[in-house]
A protein has these predicted regions:
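Transmembrane helical cores of multi-pass ion-transport proteins
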Residues: 2-619, 623-630, 634-653
């Protein structure tokens, strides 16, 4: 009855249901793989890689098995990046590559402590609001015409990104860009988004494609992509600028602890900052040409920029208002700025080489950059954000009624620090240590000795191109974890200074400009301004070409000023190469001995089986002979006596 009533009351609804596409009861393989491809990768990849172990069951090949699985999981993100990075903790001890204690120790090294401490100091800067004051003040100095404002935003973003994470820097600058663009739009200088298209539907004027997000104008894309690219490029300037730098530095230091060419804080900056400035400026020029009509005065974009130039006072008004809202510089900001400067100075003067550093004056223990970083972090908790409590002593003004907060709180750190990076970086360090200890890295390096036919410059260009291509589709840190250990051993096999390949490759891992998934800054601005992947892919062509060419040229020129022995194969590298060669020979000998032992066991087993078969055949022949003898002998005796059982039987019958 209810069913009939439904048909009568809701005939249109029923008709719509009947007109809809029928639901298929049988699953389609396409839908299955579309929804469950990650599970298929996680399940099938360990099985597909098993022939590596069956081919040669040695620690080197077992480590290669783990490496390939982790590489696929990292690139496809079939498992979360941080979960994939935990695999060595389980795989290395159970597969006889490294012990649990040794493996877990690689997850918390000096480089990792320095990185986490650097993030905490950057959060202290953010907590105090010092970063906003710095950004707005620099923009005031640079100017507020559209081109100069864009240049100012890019340079400020680049500088801040040298000291804090790229994602945090982009997240901080995006609201500033949004406020500037909104004020410019309110004054009629520019538009943030294109006007929606309308169409006639049922006699009414309705928006076309109402579900689509607003499409940003070229000016909007120029500003947002500028800060995203500047964040990635600025992170290349210092060791603490991005996790990628600390990753390849940590892997290099672990592989070559006796190297005389170190990646200390000052040397790293001298190496990378000049090239960083060049490709940041060239990227700005490209974005201006691509989006804002630079050198194309008759284009629509150039005419809009000219209107904005005539109304530069509007943007200046916005920046001035924002800066005024911050008020006077607080004691909180002053203390954080002083501590930040102290940390940078301690980095530079720890062990500069050109004069005696403060670490040289202390007892003969190795002091690395984690010490000044954590020292500043501790001071941020020890110093108060203000000194209002002194009114208890001076008896002037109202006394505080609550405890005075420190320069930063642990609650703020706990909620803002990306703790998963501990495992992501640590997994790379563990993989590098396991590949070295098992001999896998030496095996891969020696297998690439055929690349000796290439000139060093051509080989360097290939390495940079491979790194840039890989980082466009995967996490920067994951690519560095995969690529750098291989380059370490390849350089030893080819008799090349490892720094010649490792340093450029590590920097190239940060040069991801094409896709939102390439790096967090790209994803942030793509979501913030609704930038399409197609537009970002096209805009990223220019920065990619610029960074590849600039980095290659600087590695052939400026890098040799910083590291004069870059063209030579240093003594420490020769020692490392000999150790790697000995390890490779040892592994080959072990593999050969195991092969010989297997062959001997097989031949011994075959001989035993043959002997057993011979014994069985001989025993069978003897048994038949005995049976025949036992039968024929009585018959012969009966025949001799003149009787036969058969004749007797016939006679009786």
């Amino acid at each position: 009855m209810a069913k009939e009533t439904t048909k009568m009351i809701y005939p249109d609804f029923k008709m719509e249901l009947e007109a809809a596409e029928p639901v298929e009861t049988r699953p389609r393989w396409g839908n299955f793989f579309a929804n469950h491809w990650k599970g298929c990768v996680v399940f099938l990849m360990p099985l597909l890689c098993l022939p590596i172990i069956f081919m040669n069951n040695t620690p080197a090949y077992r480590c290669m098995y783990v490496l390939l699985i982790m590489a696929v999981f990292w690139v496809t993100e079939a498992l979360p990046l941080y979960v994939t990075s935990m695999i060595p903790i389980v795989a290395f001890p159970t597969m006889g590559i490294m012990g649990s204690e040794e493996t877990c120790m690689t997850y918390f090294k000096d480089t990792l402590v320095m990185f986490m401490g650097g993030i905490m100091v950057a959060l202290a800067v953010e907590y105090s609001g010092l970063h906003k004051r710095l950004a707005l003040r620099v923009i005031q100095i640079v100017g507020c015409s559209p081109r100069r404002l864009h240049f100012g935003l890019i340079m400020v973003t680049m500088f801040i990104s040298m000291w804090i994470s790229n994602a945090a820097c982009t997240a901080m600058m995006s609201p500033i860009v949004q406020a500037v663009l909104e004020e410019l739009q309110s004054q009629g200088v520019c538009k943030i988004y294109h006007e929606p298209e309308y169409q006639m539907v049922g006699g009414k004027n309705k928006k076309k494609n109402e579900d689509e997000l607003p499409y940003p104008t070229k000016v909007t894309q120029c500003y947002y992509l500028g800060i995203a690219y500047a964040s990635s490029l600025g992170g290349c300037g210092t060791i603490i600028g991005t996790a990628t730098n600390l990753t390849f530095k940590g892997i290099y230091d672990s592989a070559f602890p006796n190297a005389t060419e170190k990646m200390d804080f000052a040397t790293f900056m001298f190496y990378s900052v000049p090239s960083m400035l060049v490709y940041t400026v060239l990227t700005y020029v490209f974005l201006q040409w691509h989006f804002m009509g630079l050198w194309r005065p008759k284009s629509k974009e150039a005419q809009e920029v000219q209107v904005g130039k005539d109304n530069a006072h509007v943007a200046k008004k916005v920046i001035d208002q924002r800066y005024k809202e911050l008020g006077k510089m607080s004691i909180h900001e002053i203390q954080v700025m002083i501590l930040f400067i102290i940390m940078v100075l301690m980095y530079f003067t720890r062990k500069p080489g050109i004069f005696t550093g403060w670490a040289d004056l202390l007892p003969s223990k190795v002091i690395k950059n984690s010490m000044p970083t954590i020292f500043v972090v501790i001071m941020c908790f020890m110093l108060p954000a203000n000194y209002a409590f002194l009114r208890y002593c001076t008896r002037r003004g109202p006394v505080p009624t609550a405890p005075t907060s420190s320069l930063i709180t642990w609650k703020f750190i706990q909620t803002r620090v990306p703790w998963g990076l501990v495992f992501l970086l640590g997994g790379g360090f563990a993989l590098a240590a396991g590949s070295k200890q098992s001999g896998m890295a030496s095996l891969i390096g020696s297998s690439m000795s055929g690349l000796k036919v290439l000139p060093n410059a051509a080989l360097l260009l290939v390495v940079i191109l491979v790194a840039v291509f890989m980082t466009a589709f995967s996490s920067n840190v994951a690519v560095a974890n995969i690529l750098v250990p291989v380059l370490n051993e390849m350089s030893l096999a080819l008799k090349i200074n490892p720094l010649y390949l490792v340093f450029p490759a590590g920097l190239a891992c940060s040069m991801a400009f094409h896709l939102p998934v390439s790096t967090p800054p790209n994803a942030l601005v793509a979501g913030y301004a609704h930038i399409r992947s197609k537009d970002m892919a096209i805009a990223g062509i220019g920065p990619t070409i610029i960074t590849i060419i600039t980095l290659f040229i600087f590695c052939q020129t400026w890098a040799k000023v910083i590291y004069p022995s870059l063209d030579t194969f240093p003594e420490w590298a020769q020692i490392a190469a000999e150790e790697a060669a000995n390890k490779t020979r040892h592994l080959s000998a072990v593999a050969a001995s195991k092969t010989i032992e297997f062959a001997a066991n097989a031949s011994r087993l075959l001989a035993n089986n043959t002997e057993l078969v011979n014994d069985l055949s001989t025993g069978s022949s003897n048994l038949v002979s005995n049976i025949l003898a036992n039968i024929t002998e009585p018959l012969a005796q009966l025949a001799a006596n003149g009787t036969h059982p058969l004749t007797d039987l016939a006679f009786k019958n």
